[in-house]
Amino acid sequence: MVTPTKHAIGLRSASGVELLAHIGLDTVTFDGTPFSLKVKEGDTVKKGEVLVEFDKAFIEDIEESALHQKIFTVVS
């Protein structure tokens, strides 16, 4: 799963474990501006592969604590 705003990516392992990677707190409000996706929904990814890149300065200018909060949630 990749959100349209590019701030969150959902992953599912071969064994079915699901993980949500969420960058920042209110980064959904940026409407994708500071993010550059390197994968698309349905892609198979490997350890070490870059999933998303983002403009750290852009996020820090707007949301001082955004990059100090990275949320990873196992959903299964």
Curated annotation (Swiss-Prot):
Gene Ontology MF, one: kinase activity
PROSITE patterns in UniProt: PTS_EIIA_TYPE_1
Primary subcellular site in the record, as a coarse category: cytoplasm
Entry function: The phosphoenolpyruvate-dependent sugar phosphotransferase system (PTS), a major carbohydrate active -transport system, catalyzes the phosphorylation of incoming sugar substrates concomitant with their translocation across the cell membrane.
Domain topic, free-text comment: The EIIA domain is phosphorylated by phospho-HPr on a histidyl residue. Then, it transfers the phosphoryl group to the EIIB domain.
Pfam families: PTS_EIIA_1
Protein's name in the database: Putative phosphotransferase enzyme IIA component YyzE
